[in-house]
Amino acid sequence: MPQLNPNPWFFTMLTTWLTFLLLIQPKLLSFIMTNPPINKSSKHTKTPSWTWPWT
């Protein structure tokens, strides 16, 4: 069964991961986000309790 022979497939997988980690990932991480995250205010609004008709 040729699928069980790891010789060509392991090298292909290793090459793919190294390409992703060393070339593609730094390029993707260098982009500036268009909507940078902002801290939300610590003001917490309390919602009123719901009055259930059967209680």
Swiss-Prot record:
GO terms for cellular component: mitochondrial membrane; proton-transporting ATP synthase complex. The keyword Transmembrane applies. It is a single-pass membrane protein. One of its GO terms (biological process) is proton motive force-driven ATP synthesis. The keyword Cell inner membrane does not apply. It holds the Pfam family ATP-synt_8. Subunit 8, of the mitochondrial membrane ATP synthase complex (F(1)F(0) ATP synthase or Complex V) that produces ATP from ADP in the presence of a proton gradient across the membrane which is generated by electron transport complexes of the respiratory chain. ATP synthase complex consist of a soluble F(1) head domain - the catalytic core - and a membrane F(1) domain - the membrane proton channel. These two domains are linked by a central stalk rotating inside the F(1) region and a stationary peripheral stalk. This is ATP synthase F(0) complex subunit 8. It comes from Guira guira. The lineage of its organism: Eukaryota, Metazoa, Chordata, Craniata, Vertebrata. The gene is MT-ATP8.
